Amino acid sequence: MPKRQQVGKSGVTPCKHYLLDKILGSEFGVTSRPQFDNLSAYIVIDLTAGDGVPVTRDGELIPVFNEGCSPGICLKHLDHRAKRHPDKPAVWIAIEKQPETFQQLWKNVSSHLEQLGGWHGTDQRIYEAPVPEWNSQKEGCKLILLNMNSHEFLLHKPLTQLNLDSECAVFLYNDPNHIEDWCLSEQLVRSLPRLTTSLSTLGCNVGGMKRLEIGKRRQWFDRVDMIAGTLQEWHDACLFSIGGPDQWAYLITAPTKWRGRISESCRKAAKQVVGRKADASITWLKENQGDFKDHQRKLFLTKQELASNDY
């Protein structure tokens, strides 16, 4: 069975989607305020877009596109921006590397655009062939679907082609199935503008991660530490986990002054988990580095390794 189906059936997916929805809602709202009029655009980059097939939430007869998948959630906020703040440019870039999955993504997104109305396809390309690409526009908002490997993505290309300067704000969504799918390279992170925030999935024990040898699991430490080491001085990193045997966890980077807001969203997100009671564990790096490191160790190490104090 594909891993994405396992994840969806675990009941954790609604938690992830709730958190993404709340963070995007806040960021689209904040970047539409007058103090951000100098931004060339607010850019949302989904590095692991998938097929755009929504997951059915508990109690629903049919899945809801704008709540049940990351492309639907991103597009919901982008369309709202186009309607409410057409003078505030925004861009959504969705990247999917598998050709068949990309075709399904394109079909699902284009079908929903027809329902929303007002979106028009454009001929403006970011990449030259052979990279498959599909673009659409509504007022000052654009969406770009790219069939490529996110490991090869850098922001300067879209900025150049869209005539945007580097004075923009960026949100990154990174939802890997396993460590090899992690898309936030240090090269990408260091190339991003100073107003960049992110939400990443940390698979932790899904599929028996703690049965992997320690060298493999150390890569999760390396990924989190790399993100923590590139934080702006006014930003912080949050580890949010929801307990249980699968130990799903998320890494969030955001302005320090948003700690309270994001922590509350995390607690509410944990309540969205289906099939079990989920207890939210939340630690902020700059608030308490010791607790943050302990949180990492509990997520990535076995009980025996924790007891040995060798790691």
Which residues are covered by each model-predicted region?
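Basic, amphipathic N-terminal segments that precede the first structured/catalytic domain
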Residues: M1-Y18
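Active-site segment flanking the S-adenosylmethionine/decSAM binding pocket
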Residues: L143-I214
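Short catalytic/ligand-binding loop motif for oxyanion handling, primarily in non-cytosolic enzymes
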Residues: V53-T56, T101-Q104, L154, E180-W182, ...
